[in-house]
Amino acid sequence: MTELQAKDPRTLHTSGAAPSPTHVGSPLLARLDPDPFQGSQHSDASSVVSPIPISLDRLLFSRSCQAQELPDEKTQNQQSLSDVEGAFSGVEASRRRSRNPRAPEKDSRLLDSVLDTLLAPSGPEQSQTSPPACEAITSWCLFGPELPEDPRSVPATKGLLSPLMSRPESKAGDSSGTGAGQKVLPKAVSPPRQLLLPTSGSAHWPGAGVKPSQQPATVEVEEDGGLETEGSAGPLLKSKPRALEGMCSGGGVTANAPGAAPGGVTLVPKEDSRFSAPRVSLEQDAPVAPGRSPLATTVVDFIHVPILPLNHALLAARTRQLLEGDSYDGGAAAQVPFAPPRGSPSAPSPPVPCGDFPDCTYPPEGDPKEDGFPVYGEFQPPGLKIKEEEEGTEAASRSPRPYLLAGASAATFPDFPLPPRPPRAPPSRPGEAAVAAPSAAVSPVSSSGSALECILYKAEGAPPTQGSFAPLPCKPPAASSCLLPRDSLPAAPTSSAAPAIYPPLGLNGLPQLGYQAAVLKDSLPQVYPPYLNYLRPDSEASQSPQYGFDSLPQKICLICGDEASGCHYGVLTCGSCKVFFKRAMEGQHNYLCAGRNDCIVDKIRRKNCPACRLRKCCQAGMVLGGRKFKKFNKVRVMRALDGVALPQSVAFPNESQTLGQRITFSPNQEIQLVPPLINLLMSIEPDVVYAGHDNTKPDTSSSLLTSLNQLGERQLLSVVKWSKSLPGFRNLHIDDQITLIQYSWMSLMVFGLGWRSYKHVSGQMLYFAPDLILNEQRMKELSFYSLCLTMWQIPQEFVKLQVTHEEFLCMKVLLLLNTIPLEGLRSQSQFEEMRSSYIRELIKAIGLRQKGVVPSSQRFYQLTKLLDSLHDLVKQLHLYCLNTFIQSRALAVEFPEMMSEVIAAQLPKILAGMVKPLLFHKK
């Protein structure tokens, strides 16, 4: 740090020579210490060595302590010598004391206080406070250990550590056997110092009584311009600091010997016998003197960390790093500012520049990785570019990422946990957001819902994502840019995404979508072109009804997509389609399609094919006599739901033939069209489920109950699959979906049993499955005959009411939605909208047969009464099922796994009245 230039290299300088007038100007050379070579001769006063003072002078030291004086010369000579003081510091201090004994003392005391503050370790050891600067007697020695005359007080080995971290000992008493000019070896140096190997080139002392030669030592000092021989015994350091270099390269474990090649932690003069002498063993078990830094005896003795040179630029840079800690979040420098980086410890490092912002913070680590990119700062080399298209998010997590600092090279930290990659810009091409959208698994609600939730999303890999990580719904900019294949409709996600009107279906005779086909496909749109304008953002999903149009921001004609003028003939249409439908129905026109009955009907091409336009009007639910019933509120509510119509791109089996036959009719004929949502319910009806019962063996109660439980398990899986395809059900929260299935699975099974018994055997027997049909005779032989009679009431009611298939489908959905928890559901508003929609669908299904308001109202009352009566009937089944489950071992009845979970978790709640049944009529 301090560059010394010899003005007269030919003048010899002995150990006792007086210091030059200009030599006291450098505050970093040493403190004022007693001279270990007091018996030596003094050289001429003409030998002058002028130092170049560094910039820390006048910055670190003030003049507040000039009045302090040492007690006496004897006390100074009796002061203990630190094992980390340099030899040159003692010589120079003795020369400086002869001229001005107070000024160097002032500098050394303040330097002692400043360095004690900077380099003191953090932790509980800091409770030992260092003496103030004005009271300190010894200072730091920056250049090397100070050698005493008596070889018995010299350590056995010369320490290889930088002496900056060692603190001098406190005053010691007079030592016997040593002169006034000799130093007493400190007692607080820890014993592990004795285990250090001697450096190369060291020569053992011949004996205790032998003293080192007092001849002037000639020291060769390496300067920038070459080698220069100086007569002074004080060592001259290279102008380029080396301590940080050793820190960056090796962490300070090994250092070069004095005679070795340069590049070590500390440079010492060459061919100096004082630095090649070994040291004898030190005294042990001595207490640490007050004010001594614990690093001198604890950290430095075991952890050989090289010490940074006291350079003002380096201190300024380190202080800037600590103050501006936000720019070092990714590396280890933010946590330990003086610790070496975690690069390759043996890699050589370049010389350290001494600017205000050094580039030596991290050593170079070879070529940067391809997946690395600068997290902070504006500097980004051409080789470190983010590959937005080719590189995936997993590539960066597999390899360590180089972090670039401003003005520094890349340093890799492979053993640090990598922070997440910063979010990229939104993709510019459509479909990228769906591909890049992350998926998060949803934890099960309770232990009872684990198996059911696993079945709900068995082959999908994970339940649908929710919250802020939900897949982005398709929101195309225009209606013509969103098309769907005719064989499937993607299911709506959970409540976090925009609801889809139609879920995955299996149409046109194709097999229904299984678990794999029901996976949400983000890259596909979710509705048909005529309904794109009805898509609402997530914030509006809970405010407006799903199947109504009263609160929609814009009213669109369901036939051609033009702006609707009102509800005409029961459907929200424009004036053009209203007039067209009126003329087509009142006039005697037989429209035929020139194509395949699949022409596009929109605002521009609505006049091209009147046959397809009329077909679409009829399919949407337009009825010529609908305007006659506007005075009746019920009919008006019923017709308002006709807005939700199946678009033209969906075709059912034999659709073209049936519609072609219905379109070529006379005005006197009556049109019977099934509402589109009911058609969807027909298409998602589960297949036939078999019980696997062996009818060749005699019936026993245990065998029949076991077969019924196995059938119930399969039907429960079928209910889960059916509910996933149910329009509007997937818009509910996943917890609500599981809760509704657990509360209603028994009602759905017994209701399906009544429908099969009504359709296949006219209600004369209980049609559990094609391989398990119980007649009255077989029922009487069973122990649960009374339970069979309870279940037999449902098909008998079907026979009495002559329930149609459309009515059954709507009532089945309402059974799924007829029981909720007392505290309500998470998506209660969506649930109420869905339930109201299917109630209106039931009204429309009733209107297919019952003509007139009064018959329709009576029919609605009868069917809803039947739904209310199922609550009490199913309660008996729940009680019997729970009792059988509790006594299953004694009764030798087997219960499948998922069914057991549902029974154990939910049936006690239901029987205890912890659920809320939704009734249509008050009791």
From Swiss-Prot:
Annotated ranges, domain NR LBD: 669-903
Region (Disordered): 1-49, 67-111, 152-239, 333-371, 412-435
Keywords attached to this entry: Cytoplasm, DNA-binding, Isopeptide bond, Lipid-binding, Lipoprotein, Metal-binding, Nucleus, Palmitate, Phosphoprotein, Receptor, Steroid-binding, Transcription, Transcription regulation, Ubl conjugation, Zinc, Zinc-finger
Superkingdom of the source species: Eukaryota
PTM text: Phosphorylated on multiple serine sites. Several of these sites are hormone-dependent. Phosphorylation on Ser-293 is highly hormone-dependent and modulates ubiquitination and sumoylation on Lys-387. Phosphorylation on Ser-344 also requires induction by hormone. Basal phosphorylation on Ser-82, Ser-190 and Ser-399 is increased in response to progesterone and can be phosphorylated in vitro by the CDK2-A1 complex. Increased levels of phosphorylation on Ser-399 also in the presence of EGF, heregulin, IGF, PMA and FBS.
Subcellular localization(s) per the UniProt record: Nucleus; Cytoplasm
Residue ranges of the motif Nuclear localization signal: 184-188
Entry similarity comment: Belongs to the nuclear hormone receptor family. NR3 subfamily.
Domain notes: Composed of three domains: a modulating N-terminal domain, a DNA-binding domain and a C-terminal ligand-binding domain.
Quaternary structure note: Interacts with SMARD1 and UNC45A. Interacts with CUEDC2; the interaction promotes ubiquitination, decreases sumoylation, and represses transcriptional activity. Interacts with PIAS3; the interaction promotes sumoylation of PR in a hormone-dependent manner, inhibits DNA-binding, and alters nuclear export. Interacts with SP1; the interaction requires ligand-induced phosphorylation on Ser-344. Interacts with PRMT2. Isoform A interacts with NCOR2. Isoform B (but not isoform A) interacts with NCOA2 and NCOA1. Isoform B (but not isoform A) interacts with KLF9. Interacts with GTF2B.
Protein name: Progesterone receptor
Upper classification of the organism: Eukaryota, Metazoa, Chordata, Craniata, Vertebrata
